[in-house]
Amino acid sequence: MPPQLHNGLDFSAKVIQGSLDSLPQEVRKFVEGNAQLCQPEYIHICDGSEEEYGRLLAHMQEEGVIRKLKKYDNCWLALTDPRDVARIESKTVIITQEQRDTVPIPKSGQSQLGRWMSEEDFEKAFNARFPGCMKGRTMYVIPFSMGPLGSPLAKIGIELTDSPYVVASMRIMTRMGTSVLEALGDGEFIKCLHSVGCPLPLKKPLVNNWACNPELTLIAHLPDRREIISFGSGYGGNSLLGKKCFALRIASRLAKEEGWLAEHMLILGITNPEGKKKYLAAAFPSACGKTNLAMMNPTLPGWKVECVGDDIAWMKFDAQGNLRAINPENGFFGVAPGTSVKTNPNAIKTIQKNTIFTNVAETSDGGVYWEGIDEPLAPGVTITSWKNKEWRPQDEEPCAHPNSRFCTPASQCPIIDPAWESPEGVPIEGIIFGGRRPAGVPLVYEALSWQHGVFVGAAMRSEATAAAEHKGKVIMHDPFAMRPFFGYNFGKYLAHWLSMAHRPAAKLPKIFHVNWFRKDKNGKFLWPGFGENSRVLEWMFGRIEGEDSAKLTPIGYVPKEDALNLKGLGDVNVEELFGISKEFWEKEVEEIDKYLEDQVNADLPYEIERELRALKQRISQM
């Protein structure tokens, strides 16, 4: 942040809750400096209490920002300005002295692995936005912990925001309030500054009573200074700064420096009928079913899946060499459309109370509605779309925004893992990569080695989704499902992953790749998915146990004939599901080669190049 005077005399904001004197010195300096800059009317230091939460909700209801959903217990609906509905990659930047610290310099064109901004350009952008940006509003001070308070893997942040929606959502998504300040003491914290960019009095009327400033939106990360600065958007991924900004972009950089991993992964526990349990982590791009897998009800008798987290994993090898993982979040910020009793019954149970919905449709009896909810409507019940218009099922436009969300406490999930808040984390024995591939990629394969597994992660591709602003059904590269979230140069990130193999005593997890989404020539899915995916997890479980249930192919190990339990499944065309076509894979390798050469260029680690050449070689001999 540009230099500020920290004399504490130049702001007249009235502290309406908490006291500046009670803050640790560095936190106080951070608050006062930014109060002076942003000029809020009031300062509210959040305590995280139930009572405070109730007041915030009542205040937002009064302002018309949220409505109560009378069908459920303490559930609320926010409708945003239609210009503020998703993460905006084009306005999300990382500021470092050298461009190459943030992204590899591509062979041609622009980097797709992050956006760099120079310190000078950022200073200009900052000074054009923040002075006076909170006039007439309250600056909320949110002390929050990513990870269970007191866990050696947890990290603390302080977010300053002028949005009560952010405060309410952060109370669900993180551990937040006075207890965090007590745990922090004089320790280090990540500085997070957020403003909707609408000082009062307003220059122009709000849409849906939703404050945002789309023309000037900017989400900036300053990893060297441990700062996140976000302006102009109230939407979750841009404003709940603990989520992608801190837990992935800043944390991945901390992880590189400190020798751990911050990843876009779910964490689940799977227990076999004998009561033996293993934990797996899985990286899929947004909207490829991370939440559904993390909360799965297995169809296999006697198997059990429990959820540790559905989106982000922080992982570190312990002294015994086990890779230990925590979920740094405290809630789920899930995509609503497609969530139903059939696709994710546990998510449906989780969101019945204490949940904030954003940009879903509302039924006239005070319920929520979205595409794929699969709920019959009672006679006479009508639907109001996310655009606040009456909606009928035959309408062209969707009733809920494709990236509409539920924000709900993780503790309410009926299958939350008993160890989900364990301070030391859970031991990860398998890592799964996957994406949405309609053609060519088999249901499951296992990497040949750690190095090959890292290459498989680097080569991930998937059909584009709604969580970003891209449109259309293109197959996009999304290495490690981290493409929008890398906090530093992807070439260096690959080197960091590869370096895990050289850790003394490290028990490296097996690495797998899955594709639930392969289709036949009529465009029908070849695999039923959802709870049936437990059959694939069962095979992985056996492989981790050392079962001889795999055969070698040019792309990796696949299940031997009859090694995948298909008992009770209807017609599944196993040959088509596992078919590996030379022609397809020659093209695939070409694509991967071109992408890595162009995008990672001089920063591509030699081991990845070697894996690519070896794969080419194996395919050419098919």
From Swiss-Prot:
InterPro entries given in the database record: PEP_carboxykin_GTP_CS, PEP_carboxykinase_C, PEP_carboxykinase_GTP, PEP_carboxykinase_GTP_C, PEP_carboxykinase_GTP_N, PEP_carboxykinase_N
Major location (coarse): cytoplasm
Pfam families assigned: PEPCK_GTP, PEPCK_N
Catalytic reaction annotation: oxaloacetate + GTP = phosphoenolpyruvate + GDP + CO2; L-seryl-[protein] + GTP = O-phospho-L-seryl-[protein] + GDP + H(+)
Induction profile: Regulated by cAMP, dexamethasone, glucagon and by insulin. Dexamthasone, glucagon and cAMP increase levels, insulin decreases levels.
Chain intervals for the UniProt region annotation (Omega-loop): 457-487
Binding of substrate, residues: R87, Y235, G236, G237, S286, N403, S404, R405
Residues reported in the UniProt entry to bind GTP: A287, C288, G289, K290, T291, N292, R405, R436, F530, G531, E532, N533
Cofactor descriptive note: Binds 1 Mn(2+) ion per subunit.
Pathway this chain belongs to: Carbohydrate biosynthesis; gluconeogenesis
Entry-annotated residues carrying Phosphoserine: S19, S90, S118, S286
Modified residues (Phosphothreonine): T178
Residues the record marks as active site: C288
Family under the similarity heading: Belongs to the phosphoenolpyruvate carboxykinase [GTP] family.
Biological role stated in the UniProt entry: Cytosolic phosphoenolpyruvate carboxykinase that catalyzes the reversible decarboxylation and phosphorylation of oxaloacetate (OAA) and acts as the rate-limiting enzyme in gluconeogenesis. Regulates cataplerosis and anaplerosis, the processes that control the levels of metabolic intermediates in the citric acid cycle. At low glucose levels, it catalyzes the cataplerotic conversion of oxaloacetate to phosphoenolpyruvate (PEP), the rate-limiting step in the metabolic pathway that produces glucose from lactate and other precursors derived from the citric acid cycle.
Additional observations: In eukaryotes there are two isozymes: a cytoplasmic one and a mitochondrial one.
Protein name: Phosphoenolpyruvate carboxykinase, cytosolic [GTP]
Organism: Rattus norvegicus
